[in-house]
Amino acid sequence: MPGLKKILCSLIVLLSFSLAVSATASKGPVVQKNQDKSLVQWMDYGAALEKAKTDPKLIFVDLYADWCVPCRIMDANVYNNPTVASILNTQFYAVKLDADSQDSIVCDAKKNTVQRCYFDVWELHALPAFVLVAPKGMSILTVTDSMSPEELRYMLYQFLEKEKEWISR
């Protein structure tokens, strides 16, 4: 019987823990599942590179994965911020790429899958991640971090201060 008491106590503790985790998870942030509702006008990567040839702007590439919870939170809370969306829509070519994708793109003058660009060319290993790309297609810098709307807005303004220097790359 003492073994049965231990098992029963363990089951009760496990059940209590499961209920606590479940209750906490249900109070988490609302996550946007449909990217079509985003305020940011996301472009195809190839189209952004083509457009940048005739109308030079920096290309802001957001890398995400379907399994990345912080990426979904960024979609819901940061990219749906009217100020952030306005800056991205008017001052940059905004691109969203699935880091797990096997689609081919040209990154830093090399044709690779998005996944290979993520790991090998841009040397990223965490999500969410951002790559700033010059109009000629060369990456300028990478950032791996989740941010608030205010932090991203500040970072975008910092990019714009260096835009003239970076556009020629």
Protein language model regions, located:
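Bacterial N-terminal signal peptides
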Residues: 9-18
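N-proximal helix/coil linker or "cap" segments that precede and/or mark the start of modular domains
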Residues: 22-39, 169
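Short pre-active-site segment immediately N-terminal to redox-active cysteine/selenocysteine motifs
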Residues: 56-59, 64-67, 126
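Conserved redox-active cysteine motifs that mediate thiol-disulfide chemistry
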Residues: 63-79
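The C-terminal output helix
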Residues: 161-166
